[in-house]
A protein has these predicted regions:
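Chymotrypsin/trypsin-fold serine protease catalytic domain
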Residues: 194-197, 204-208, 212, 223-298
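A short beta-turn/strand-edge loop motif at beta-sheet boundaries
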Residues: 171-172, 178-180, 390-397
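Protease-domain processing segments flanking chymotrypsin-fold serine proteases, especially trypsin-like
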Residues: 36-153, 352-353
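C-terminal segment of classical bacterial N-terminal signal peptides
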Residues: 21-32
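Active-site-proximal beta-strands of protease catalytic cores
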Residues: 158-163, 254-266, 287-293, 300-329
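C-terminal subregion of chymotrypsin/trypsin-like serine protease catalytic domains
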Residues: 41-44, 305-359
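Extracellular/luminal regions of secreted and cell-surface proteins that mediate adhesion/ECM remodeling
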Residues: 355-491
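Conserved catalytic-core segment of clan PA serine endopeptidases
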Residues: 109-132, 138-148, 154, 173-238
Length: 491
């Protein structure tokens, strides 16, 4: 049994024993989609809308620099030493393809057959399935430079993207005379649109071993291996869903319709909106899927995928990697680094390794009937989602504490409003939306606001369970619900 607990996470609360009332809750399987002790400081999470990012140019293809022994190997940073390490070889995968997980009502994409990829078109509702599985990425490097790319969720907590979005060969982004280096931090935001992240964002760090890149890219800048995994320590895919992925034979690609969704940021685009295009590949190569279009910076890492209309499943086939320009005759091409059988096996193995094999319940997405209340009000309704981030199912009676905080970090040092329980059989990588029953809805305290003006507070929950990772049993800052409490008392 191997479970990785993130040591960098802030321990925001301690488990305290309490007597909880047994109550009946309305449970609906979600269709995806004040103490004397000081409170710990809130996490230093940075809203990506505030980042000043440079364009990540879509690189032009070039020959590999020398040769690399074992280019199929995966490389990450050893958190203990800070040095690159090659991960052990992956065993044979248990499946021939990984299936997508839809977490909400299905939204159909255009299905008109085309001989080649058409023009980019703006996605009108990027917060909807299936487009919200695409994430905008900000990569921050040792020099302080920040660049933007795209990625695709292929698990509740794993993003697939281009290797050059994670490990750069641009010396200007590195320090200490290095000519190539890892990004220090990567921030991802699903369904991003015009500085709005409807599902919040997640940060990952190189020093925690969150980034995995193919050895062929790291040592030879080989575009056949321009692919990377970004592991997330929050399963944001529980709110958005995720795509499957898998390899196929050369002949399988002929005549089929494919899609690619991302965030072009080079003129005439500015990276603020999600765009998509669709069509058939013009050339099928051993390590690349190629179509005759001009690519744009910011699209790097976009997943190119196939929609199986018979099963309503989506399968990522590769990632947007590089451009190729020809002058006789003149044409531009986009090369997508292909998921080969070997790459699929490695991806599958690393996702399994990243997923706990003991249940891990994570609360998220707090909703209330209003965002403004008076002192003494009882909430009209409240619900939240609980996700089991694990490879195993778990039947569990869960005791829950509801807190009100003066900031968005929910802890046991905040004001306890109410408690309740629910029982559910959690599937692996699945969850339930909990609707608090009327008799257990929390009341806003009468003595909460001491000033002569309205004040902002945040409401959230803590799950009182001893699962595989107790650091995520409190709702995270972005999922706590902000409330405005009127200072006037209405009786």
């Amino acid at each position: 049994m191997k479970i990785t607990l993130k040591t960098r996470r802030i321990l925001r609360w301690l488990l305290a024993g309490s007597l909880f009332l047994l109550t009946t809750l309305s449970l609906t399987p979600w269709q995806p989609a004040l103490a004397q002790d000081p409170e710990p400081p809130p996490p230093q999470s940075v809203d990506p809308a505030t980042l000043e990012a440079d364009l990540e140019p879509l690189p032009a293809w070039s020959s590999p620099i020398g040769t690399t022994e074992n280019p199929e190997a995966l490389v990450t940073i050893d958190p203990a030493t800070g040095l690159n390490i090659i991960l052990p070889p992956a065993p044979p995968a248990a499946e021939s393809a990984s299936v997508s997980q839809m977490m909400d009502t299905f939204v159909q994409l255009a299905t008109g057959e085309e001989r080649a990829f058409g023009s980019l078109t703006v996605v009108p509702n990027p917060e909807d399935w299936p487009d919200r599985t695409a994430v905008k990425m900000w990569s921050e490097y040792p020099s302080g430079a920040t660049t933007v790319c795209t990625g695709i969720l292929i698990d509740s907590s794993v993003v697939l993207t281009a290797g050059h979005c994670v490990y750069t060969w641009e010396a200007s982004r590195c320090t200490g005379g290095a000519t190539k280096c890892w990004a220090d931090k990567i921030t991802v935001a699903p369904g991003w649109e015009n500085n709005n992240s409807p599902y919040g964002w997640v940060e990952s760090f190189a020093v925690s071993g969150d980034f995995i890149v193919w050895n062929g890219w790291i040592n030879s800048k080989d575009y056949d291996y321009d692919m990377a995994l970004v592991k997330l320590d929050f399963p944001i895919g529980a709110l958005t869903g995720w795509f499957g992925y898998g390899p196929n034979s050369d002949s399988w690609y002929i005549g089929r319709l494919f899609h690619s969704t991302g965030y072009p940021a080079a003129p005439p685009y500015d990276g603020s909106d999600m765009y998509t295009w669709q069509g058939s590949y013009d050339t099928i190569e051993e390590f690349a899927l190629v179509h005759e279009n001009m690519g744009y910076g910011g699209q790097s890492g976009s997943g190119t995928y196939y929609w199986n209309t018979a099963t309503d499943q989506y399968f990522v086939q590769g990632v947007h990697s590089h451009t190729r320009t020809y002058y006789s005759p003149p044409k531009d091409e986009v090369g997508n680094t292909r998921i080969t059988t070997s790459k699929f096996t490695s991806i599958y193995d690393r996702i399994q390794d990243h997923t706990p094999d003991i249940y891990d319940l994570v609360p998220m997405d707090i909703n209330t009937d209003s965002s403004t209340y008076n002192r003494g009000d009882i909430l009209g309704s409240m619900n939240y989602y609980v996700f089991n981030h694990a490879s195993v199912s778990k039947s569990k009676t869960v005791s829950v504490s509801v807190y009100l905080s003066s900031n968005d970090t929910i802890s046991i040092f905040d004001t306890l409003l109410s408690t309740h329980q629910f029982t559910w059989n959690f599937p692996a990588n699945g969850g339930v939306r909990v609707t608090v029953s009327p008799g257990d809805l929390p009341r806003i305290p009468y003595n909460l606001v001491s000033t002569d003006s309205d004040e902002d507070f945040w409401i959230g929950v803590i799950l009182n369970v001893s699962d595989s990772d107790t650091s995520d049993n409190a709702v995270r800052d972005q999922d706590a619900k902000k409330l405005t409490i009127n200072h006037t008392i209405f009786i």
